[in-house]
Amino acid sequence: MSAPRYKSGSAKKVYKKAPGNSSIVHYRRKKQSNAVCGACGALLNGVPRGRAVEITKLAKTQKRPERAFGGNLCPKCVKKMMVAKARNF
């Protein structure tokens, strides 16, 4: 019987062949989904993909791009927003 921690949806089953032609199940953590832009939903470049535990071990500069709204908006949406704010200013 599997342990309770493996019964949740966050554990991914991987079937392996063991010696003697027996099949065993390994459990792995699923990967986090890619970060997306808050405005248009496009995938964000420069933002790591991983669980929170793995990301907290990274340096601050490796967690998101060093530009305005880095890690939240894609460059196209940032440019559109800045142009719109400059025109309304």
From Swiss-Prot:
Transmembrane feature ranges: none
Coiled coil: none
The entry's keywords: Ribonucleoprotein, Ribosomal protein
Gene3D superfamilies: 6.20.340.10
One Pfam match: Ribosomal_L34e
Keyword RNA-binding attributed: no
GO molecular function terms listed in the Swiss-Prot or TrEMBL record: structural constituent of ribosome
GO biological process: translation
Gene Ontology cellular component annotations, sorted alphabetically: ribonucleoprotein complex; ribosome
HAMAP family: Ribosomal_eL34
Family: Belongs to the eukaryotic ribosomal protein eL34 family.
This protein's name: Large ribosomal subunit protein eL34
Native organism taxonomy: Archaea, Methanobacteriati, Methanobacteriota, Methanomada group, Methanococci
